[in-house]
UniProtKB/Swiss-Prot annotation:
SMART domains: Elp3. This is Ribosomal protein uS12 methylthiotransferase RimO. The gene is rimO. It is found in: Cytoplasm. SUPFAM superfamilies: Radical SAM enzymes (SSF102114). It comes from Desulfosudis oleivorans (strain DSM 6200 / JCM 39069 / Hxd3) (Desulfococcus oleovorans).
Amino acid sequence: MKVHLTSLGCAKNQVDSELMLGAFAAEGLTVCDDPAGADVLVVNTCAFIEDAVNEAVDTILALARYKSEGSCRRLIVCGCLPERFGEELAGALPEADFFFGTGAYHRVIEAVAGKESTLSRCTLPPPDAVPMQAAADRRICATPHTVYVKIAEGCDRRCTYCIIPRLRGRQRSRPPADIVVEARGLVAAGAKELVLVAQETTAYGADLSPPVSLASLLMALSDAVGDIWVRVLYMHPDTMDPDLIRVMTERDNLCSYFDVPVQHASDRVLKRMGRRHTAADLHRLFDDIRRADPDAVLRTTVLVGFPGEKPADFEKLLDFITGVAFDHLGAFIYSDDEALSSHGLDGHVSSKTARHRYDRVMTAQIDISSRRLAKRVGSREPVLVEEKAEDGLFFGRAWFQAPEVDGDVCFSGAGDYAPGDRVSVRITGASAYDLTGEAQ
C-alpha cells in the first residue's frame, strides 16, 4: 500500500509528520512523494491563525480530488485543525474519512493500515493525554543534514493572542536521555545541524521529576554530538537565565543564536497580551546576552495591530527594535479570531493601519539587517552547504542564519561541495538579508 503525507505549518508539525512517516515505513507501507499515486492520503494540518485554517481546508479539498479522480481510497486529516474544530470539521468535510487531533497522532497508523475497526471517524482525546513520544525512527522530510528535534510539547502560558495551549495541551518535556539518544542517532545518520524546537524551549524540563533545565540538556547534547551545530529556537524571555546564556555563548558547538520572540515593547500592550515582562526586562536580557558574547546573534518576532495598540505604543515598539538592533526579525499582523481571549478586547486596529505599521517595522529592519550583515564582509565564516546551483554557485547558511527564516550565503568555489558539507567562506558582499562569498 502506498501512502502520501502533506505536512503544513511549523517545524514542530514537521517533526510530528516525520514520526508518522517513520511509523508508516515500519508497518511496511510505501511512502510516496506524489499524491496521485497514493492509496492513502494524510494531511497534517495547522490552525494557528485564519490563514493557516484556510490553507489547510484548501489543501484537504485539493487532495480529495484524488479520491474521485485517482487511485486514492482514503483521506485522513490530523493535527491542529481537527483538534480545534472537532466534529464540526468532520461535518463540513465529508470528503475526508478520518480525523485525528493532536493527542492521537499515534493512532493515525491504524487508519492508514486499514485497521479502522477500532476507530470512530473522529479521534479527539485531550491533546496532553499522551506523554511525549520517545525517540523513534523518523523519515526526514527536508534535508538530512539539518534536522529539527522536538524537546517538549504543549504550553502552560495563556497569552491572549495565542490558541496553542488549547491545541497542544499543557507542557510535556521529553526525558533528556531520550533526546540525547535521538541526537546521537541523527548525527550517525548524517545530521550536521540539530535545531531544538518546542512551544517554549526555555521552559524545557520544568515539568519533569526531578526538574531539569534547558542549560543542562544543552551541555549533555554538546558533549554527545561532537562538531556539529546545535541551535535553539522559540525561547521565552521569562524563562531565560544567566546559566543558559553562559552555556550557549561558551560552548563551541552550541550556536550563540538567540531566537526570543518579544511580540511587543509597550508595557501597556504587553499586559493586554498576557505577557508578564516589561520593556525594561527585555532590554536587560538582550544587554546581558551581548555582554556575554558581543558576537551573539539576536532574532525576534513582533506582533503589530494588536487590539488597543495606539500610535504611542507602536512608536515604543519601533524605538525598541532600532535600539536593540536585532540581527533578524519577523513581524506579523494581528489576526483576530473569536477563539482568542484577545477577541473581546476593545480598540481593534484597522487592517490599513496595521499594514502600515507592519511596513514601517520591516523597513526599519531592512536598514538594521543591512548594517549588521555589512560588518561581516571580509570575515571568514563556516557555511553549511544546502544547494549546488547549475552555474557553479553554492547556497548555504552560516551559524548565524537559521533554516527557512533567515537569509543565506551564496558563494563560489572550485571544490565539488555537496549538501551537508561545511565550507570556510570569505564574505565578499552583503544585502539586506543575504551574503555572498568565496570558498577558501
